[in-house]
């Protein structure tokens, strides 16, 4: 919790407060691209179901899952090549040539939801194939973003929790409106489905002081990405599959490790 204490102390200093808010309150990382308006449509929770995600296994195609920043990266695919259950999964296909570099490049799978209460648990499965690391900061993660949260301070436009799943062992960059919680620090295992889960409500309570209430929407992103790639180092490649994604009460979690 010392990071939170230091952060709040800095925000009390007027000059630093303006700087911090200016560089670190984008929906993704400081200096990153801004999502095109209308790309993702917030969803009401499915009626009569514990899972807040619509189409969690991609058996009904891609919607209402969406992709952000299509000017930077291609959209996700619905694949029948590999699936944890059923016949389909979501595929993020990273293909970045060796000569390309940059601060960050993110391949996304996103759903936005508007539940009345903040959910308890996220779980699911990922699978990695063809992992070629083009920079030390190449990794998988999922991100939970709560927008317009009146009960959390400081008063950022959004409050985030970020969950690296594999590929990095240290925080990849500084961001004022997010905390990192590592679910894995090793290189990703390839050729097998890997289960993950996290009580996101407890994490918001621990790191932000309370679970979000009164928010306008939640955005959940499942990613493969890199940060700080130097041109000419190596190609950054991966095929990352996500399937059987769940967000809701822990007691109703349909997934098992």
Task: For each feature predicted by the language model, list its residue ranges.
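Extracellular ligand-binding interfaces
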Residues: 128-189, 241
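Secreted extracellular polysaccharide-interacting domains
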Residues: 92-117, 121, 173-183
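C-terminal motif of bacterial Sec signal peptides marking the signal peptidase cleavage site
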Residues: 21-24
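Extracellular carbohydrate-recognition regions
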Residues: 27-72, 256-257
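Extracellular beta-strand ligand-recognition surfaces/modules
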Residues: 58, 124, 141-143, 190-236
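Bacterial N-terminal signal peptides that target proteins for export
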Residues: 1-12
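Extracellular glycan-recognition surfaces and repeat-rich motifs
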Residues: 58-94
């Amino acid at each position: 919790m010392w990071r939170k204490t230091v952060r709040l102390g800095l925000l009390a200093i007027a000059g630093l407060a303006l700087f911090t808010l200016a560089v670190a309150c984008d929906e993704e990382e400081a200096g990153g691209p801004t999502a095109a308006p209308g790309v993702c449509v917030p969803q009401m929770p499915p009626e009569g179901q514990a899972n807040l995600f619509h189409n969690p296994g991609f058996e009904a195609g891609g919607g209402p899952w969406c992709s952000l920043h299509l000017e930077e990266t291609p959209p996700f695919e619905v694949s029948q090549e590999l699936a944890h259950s059923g016949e389909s999964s979501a595929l993020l296909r990273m293909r970045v040539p060796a000569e390309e570099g940059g601060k960050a490049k993110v391949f996304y799978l996103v759903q936005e939801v508007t539940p009345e209460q903040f959910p308890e648990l996220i779980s699911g499965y990922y699978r990695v194939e063809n992992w070629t690391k083009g920079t030390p900061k190449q990794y998988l993660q999922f991100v939970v973003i709560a927008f317009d949260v009146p009960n959390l301070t400081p008063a950022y436009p959004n409050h985030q929790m970020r969950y690296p799943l594999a590929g990095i062992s240290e925080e990849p960059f500084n961001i004022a409106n997010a905390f990192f919680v590592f679910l894995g620090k090793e290189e990703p295992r390839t050729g097998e489905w890997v289960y993950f889960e996290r009580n996101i409500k407890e994490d918001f309570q621990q790191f932000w002081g309370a679970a979000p209430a009164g928010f306008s929407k939640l955005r959940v992103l499942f990613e493969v990405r890199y940060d700080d790639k130097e041109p000419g180092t190596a190609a950054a490649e991966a095929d990352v599959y996500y399937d059987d994604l769940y967000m809701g009460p822990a007691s109703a979690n349909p997934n098992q490790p």
